[in-house]
Design a protein with these regions (language model features):
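Mature-chain termini and adjacent capping regions
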Residues: 1-192
Length: 192
């Protein structure tokens, strides 16, 4: 009789442990999935009217990146920016300005993708006229001085040059600018 009672007690005790383990496992899974849903829905941080500067080794300005609104999503390794402005400097003088409606910062700033009504303006110098580039998407690799696009582009250079094409690559290190496809050039001879 005693062995039956102890065997029953052991089985009952094992059953209670199994039920509580199952219950706790389900609670942990449910809590983990609800935390995961909270993480994916909200940004890790949020900034308004921000400005970020990067300098060269000698301390001179390389570029300033600013915008109206920045949201960073850790789970996607991406930062979204509204109305970004990218100012490039040469010898501490503003060389070019790029504006758009949206941008994605990828890999902690190694790549910036400007989207929606992108306008690049290269300011005039003593040897060059003002140049404007229009596209729907522009990829900037600020650490490599490399800019590219796979979208249709339009370049307008003073006084009367207009270039259209699809896709472009600008590599400052190699000092090359290539339009990839469907290039058309319109040139109007200046009036004297």
């Amino acid at each position: 009789m005693e062995t039956k009672f102890s065997a029953f007690f052991v089985l009952f005790f094992i059953l209670i442990i199994a039920i509580s383990s199952y219950y706790l496992k389900n609670e942990v899974i449910r809590e983990f999935s609800s935390n995961e849903q909270k993480i994916t829905g909200a940004p890790e941080f949020y900034l308004k009217n921000f400005s970020s500067k990067q300098t060269k080794k000698d301390g001179s300005l390389k570029f300033i990146f600013s915008g109206n609104e920045m949201k960073s999503f850790k789970h996607a390794d991406i930062t979204k920016v509204k109305f970004p402005i990218f100012k490039k400097f040469e010898n501490n003088i503003e060389h070019s300005l790029i504006v758009s409606e949206n941008a994605d910062i990828i890999n902690k700033g190694d790549q910036i993708i400007l989207k929606d009504n992108v306008t690049l303006t290269r300011f005039p110098t003593k040897t060059r006229k003002q140049l404007k580039l229009f596209t729907s998407e522009l990829n900037i690799f600020p650490n490599d001085d490399y800019v590219s696009s796979s979208q249709p582009i339009k370049i307008v250079q003073e006084p009367n040059i207009e270039i259209n094409g699809v896709g472009m690559i600008y590599n400052k290190t190699e000092n090359t600018f290539k339009i990839l496809k469907k290039v058309t050039v319109y040139y109007e001879k200046p009036k004297k």
